[in-house]
Swiss-Prot record:
Keywords: 2Fe-2S, Abscisic acid biosynthesis, Auxin biosynthesis, FAD, Flavoprotein, Iron, Iron-sulfur, Metal-binding, Molybdenum, NAD, Oxidoreductase. Gene3D superfamilies: 3.10.20.30, 3.30.465.10, [2Fe-2S]-binding domain, Aldehyde oxidase/xanthine dehydrogenase, a/b hammerhead, Aldehyde oxidase/xanthine dehydrogenase, molybdopterin binding domain, CO dehydrogenase flavoprotein, C-terminal domain. Residues 9-98 form the 2Fe-2S ferredoxin-type domain. The keyword Iron applies. This is Probable aldehyde oxidase 4.
Amino acid sequence: MTKVVAPVERVVFELNGERQEVAAADVEPSTTLLEFIRTRTPFRGPKLGCGEGGCGACVILIAKYNPKTDEVTEFNVNSCLTLLYSIHFCSIITTEGLGNTKDGFHSIQKRMSGFHASQCGFCTPGMCMSIFSSLVNADKSKKPAPPKGFSKLSISEAERSFSGNMCRCTGYRPIVDACKSFESDVDLEDLGLNIFWKKGDKHPDPTKLPSYTLGGGICTFPDFLKSEIKSSLDFNDASISGPREGWYCPKSIKQYYKLVNSGLFSESSVKVVVGNTSTGVYKDQDLYDKYIDIAGIPELSAIVRKDKGIEIGAATSISRTIEILNQESELTSSPNGSVVFRKLAEHMSKVASPFVRNTASIGGNIILAHKYPFRSDIATILLGAAATVNLQVSSKTLHVNLEQFLEQPPLDHSTLLLSIFIPHWASDCKKEHTLVFETYRAAPRPLGNAVSYVNSAFLGHVSLDKSSGDNILSNLHLAFGAYGTKHAIRARKVEEYLTGKILSASVVLEAIRLLRETIVPVEGTTHPEYRVSVAVGFLFSFLSPLCKGVIESGKTLSISEDLVDTDNVHNKPLSSRRETLSDDEYTPVGDPIKKYKVEVQASGEAIYVDDIPAPKNCLYGEFIYSTQPLANVKSIKFKPSLASKKIITVVSAKDIPTGGRNIGSTFWFGDEEPLFGDPIAEFAGQVLGVVIAETQPYADMAAKQAVVEYTTDGLKAPILTVEQAVQSNSYFQVPPERAPKQVGDFSNGMAEADHKIMSEEVKLSSQYYFYMETQTALAIPDEDNTMTVYSSSQFSELAQNVISKCLGIPFNNVRVITRRAGGGFGGKVVRSLHVRI
């Protein structure tokens, strides 16, 4: 094979002040930074929560150095998505690098403790790193210097600093207070209960707060790594490769096509990456042994300002794109020219979370929207702004509008998305016209960190009809997405109908009727009526201020610069709260005191089950779940894949020791649930077997390769709803000793009631427990047929009982240890037992 690039045999970076050098042959390219930190270093601060960039438990700070400008850039990222090979010559800081029991705790960690901002503590290290990143970047800004001991961070920035971090315990208020305490203009009296001063003090003393050094007080990029970068001949090398796998870093488009056309990937799976954040949305279905990292191609990160707009490289991060759009909005003198960029930036700041936006590329988001039915906000709002894309197809460069691109069939590696061009529309808007542009989104969390139920973007030119004084729309772009469609679309019929018409109530109603014909969710879309109604509401919100007869009686809206620069009512307000305090009758009972070991939780040194160092030759397991309700399991096979080769064995009901039982859990009512669905899977999601592999990622991926064959011969139809259970007379029998006792006479009480509900129906759906720490257990066999199980459990005695029954050993031969749990809320009582066993 022709040599394409010179290989580099190592990955060099700094971790909490220490130089790390990893031989490429020792670490596979699919290894994430989180996996490396937790399995190859003593640091356990970053936690594995959701594993998809949605919870923030794994957040760390990355610093990059540019030797050409001698500048250091710091930003926080999800270490669960960041691939280890992508941080070559970077500096990494985890919460242990901020402070610890040996070197002393950082003021962030101390204030998290003092403001009672931690309960289970599993999310706390990630919270600390998000706050630290915000402080570092705020202190580097050109804002006036704050008083000693404070940061340049504003209150709104403080609230947004951990907008992507989840906490199930605290309700966020104490975390917000801890972060706000760094802000120089904060009213200390408004901060919540803390140990630094008594609630009600009229003049709290800020010097009692743990001292803070401007800039965070931590060196984010060491001099030794700067020197190594400057002197290293590897800095511009194009690949990192080992004997089995490869990580390729082309430094030009030409090098990229040399790699693609080299035949190197003809018999292996290859993945093209920039930030690898797509795996948080669409999970990899198999392992990859070769990666092409295109983030280092300069052309893909170039920013080109043109007469009619701006061209942004496809590998530019979403965070960087927001900065650029805001800068362009400020530089553009015309209100018509600034509105598009400003509104786009505002909307993009609500996409994903800050640490996802820091690494996710704008081009990658559009590629996802093209390849999958991804509910992309960015694709929709760029479609509304009439953006175009530039593609490289082998030796040809193509320019197509975004709508055409989204409708194309999936691309192969021979096609490269180069850039996105966004027009500012200033020069296209006549003097007598005013440009209007608005974007909308409806989501479970409308201000970010959740995909949309519906999103839209509307652009148009508004002019006045001289005879009537009414508004007329032209050059309309009405884009809708995420409502249950493969990709974002333009409502062409509505655009054509509205163009040139004088806006009135009847015109708006007809436009809504046409929109309902256009917005048709595909079959299987959840809540289709809701999505359509939201889309209609967005269009109405856009048109109604422009239309007489829809706005309040007696008011008219003239076209002016005010129309262009209206405040976005969807912008995030500063949060508010209300505290109810008890009196001092029983003091000191109820006085705020510091919770035990919060600093240790904040520094990442508190040990949860998955933080326990794995014993030598430790194996890992992942469940194979039933995908069918009430079906006979005939066989379990595995697809031929890279992941399937990692399987050591599969444990099932036949592997239960002699004398043991197929028992997975037991209930207070006396019923038992089997550990494995054998020979019948009683419900979808029941465990059928456990894949065993050398690492947890191997086991997780291998379990996805399982192909289960079912048959329903001789079985009745499954009962899937409460209504079906009632109809089938299938009731859960509560033992008499467990049944609730009747208090009073129900019949007499109803007869004497002043108000009666004669008939009503109430439905309660299921709800996630949403504990941050996932179900985890570590089992270590010991002498004399005993077993020690470290478990994140809320009922260790029950776990001990069920494990002994399953293994067929005496109760006292099982030792279950629970040091702490990263949340539970009832979800780690019975449902955790399968994992323990």
